[in-house]
């Protein structure tokens, strides 16, 4: 063994020893992971994510994955010649778009992520289980209503978003059964919901993750994004904040674009019983492990 290899071994042992207190903190605790962004479409990054999820399970954590798929849906709609329009960041979803969205989310992305997890955990028999909110009525949803101000009359007008929904009820029994099974299952949930009448709805994945984390009373919700976390007015990373400070970022306009719904869903999750939410860069290898098992973590921690 070379000196370099020996030093690397000692460094690995030191890292594992330093992680012990954090491993004990998360033992048998549920962590909901919102997996999305452009990193989800990169096979090498997806394999690292799957391996990290398996490692969490083997360390005693109960990971639950909720995934998005906006870019993949857009590509499929383009191929089908279906034009997309958006209101407040939500895709207007007619019947044809809903059919494509469900096919991509539940039929392609969901099963691919579950398969990567199963492959990564094959030696230890850790398995990914692909689900959508329609399974066992995991997510009951209703139609989203939005208004938009007419630029000419300055009057708020209702906007029909089609089959875009928001959760009204989350029944976590199926997820809890998988997590407490004698087998090592990792649930992977597509953000599709169903109304009491059986209508299918496309739901924002951040919203689903927050609602599910609240229903499961998760220890943490990790929101993997394409940026390093929440930034202040100077573009610097905010390491930690309260939900009051998160609201202030929204109210003062410091938080913009896609960060607004992320903060809103983080606030809602914490108010529903989640201990803390972390917004972090999912493109960085092993970001989840750094956040959960190191002193300084990664990204922005939001707590009550």
Swiss-Prot record:
Q: Where located?
A: Cytoplasm
Gene Ontology biological process terms, A to Z = arginine biosynthetic process via ornithine; L-arginine biosynthetic process
Residues annotated as binding substrate: 69-70, 91, 202
E.C. designation(s): 2.7.2.8
Q: Name one Pfam family in it.
A: AA_kinase
Q: Which key words are in the record?
A: Amino-acid biosynthesis, Arginine biosynthesis, ATP-binding, Cytoplasm, Kinase, Nucleotide-binding, Transferase
| GO molecular function per UniProt | acetylglutamate kinase activity; ATP binding
CDD domains, sorted: AAK_NAGK-C
Q: Which residues carry the site feature described as Transition state stabilizer? A: 34, 262
User: What Gene3D superfamilies does the database record attribute to this sequence?
Assistant: Acetylglutamate kinase-like
Can you quote a single GO CC term? cytoplasm
InterPro entries named among the record's database cross-references: AceGlu_kinase-like_sf (IPR036393), AcgluKinase_fam (IPR004662), ArgB (IPR037528), Asp/Glu/Uridylate_kinase (IPR001048), Glu/AcGlu_kinase (IPR001057), NAGK-C (IPR041727)
What pathway does the UniProt record associate with this protein?
A: Amino-acid biosynthesis; L-arginine biosynthesis; N(2)-acetyl-L-ornithine from L-glutamate: step 2/4
Please list the reactions this protein catalyses.
N-acetyl-L-glutamate + ATP = N-acetyl-L-glutamyl 5-phosphate + ADP
The record ties this protein, via NCBIfam families, to: argB
Similarity annotation: Belongs to the acetylglutamate kinase family. ArgB subfamily.
Q: Outline what the protein does.
A: Catalyzes the ATP-dependent phosphorylation of N-acetyl-L-glutamate.
Q: What is this protein called?
A: Acetylglutamate kinase
Tell me the gene name.
Answer: argB
């Amino acid at each position: 063994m070379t000196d370099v290899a020996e030093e690397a071994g000692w460094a690995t042992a030191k890292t594992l020893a330093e992680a012990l207190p954090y491993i004990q903190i998360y033992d048998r605790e549920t962590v909901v992971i919102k997996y999305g962004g452009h990193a989800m479409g990169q096979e090498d990054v997806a394999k690292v994510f799957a391996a990290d999820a398996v490692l969490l399970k083997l360390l005693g954590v109960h990971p639950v994955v909720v995934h998005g798929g906006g870019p993949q849906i857009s590509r499929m709609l383009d191929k089908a010649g279906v034009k997309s329009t958006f209101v407040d960041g939500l895709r207007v979803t007619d019947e044809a778009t809903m059919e494509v969205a469900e096919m991509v989310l539940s039929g392609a992305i969901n099963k691919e992520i579950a398969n990567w997890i199963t492959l990564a955990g094959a030696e230890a028999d850790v398995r990914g289980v692909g689900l959508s909110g329609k399974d066992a009525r995991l997510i009951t949803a209703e139609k989203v209503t939005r208004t938009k101000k007419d630029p000419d009359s300055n009057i708020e007008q209702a906007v029909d978003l089609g089959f875009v929904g928001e959760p009204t009820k989350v029944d976590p029994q199926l997820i809890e059964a998988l997590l407490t099974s004698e087998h090592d299952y990792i649930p992977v949930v597509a953000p599709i919901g169903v109304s009491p009448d059986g209508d299918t709805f496309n739901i924002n994945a951040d919203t689903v993750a927050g609602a599910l984390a609240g229903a499961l009373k998760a220890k943490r919700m990790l929101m993997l994004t394409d940026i390093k976390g929440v930034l202040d007015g100077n573009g610097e990373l905010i390491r930690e904040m309260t939900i009051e400070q998160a609201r202030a970022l929204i109210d003062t306009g410091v938080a913009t674009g896609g960060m607004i719904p992320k903060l809103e869903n983080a606030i809602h999750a914490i108010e529903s019983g989640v201990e803390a939410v972390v917004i972090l860069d999912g493109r960085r290898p092993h970001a989840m492990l750094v956040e959960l098992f190191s002193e300084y973590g990664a990204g922005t921690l939001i707590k009550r």
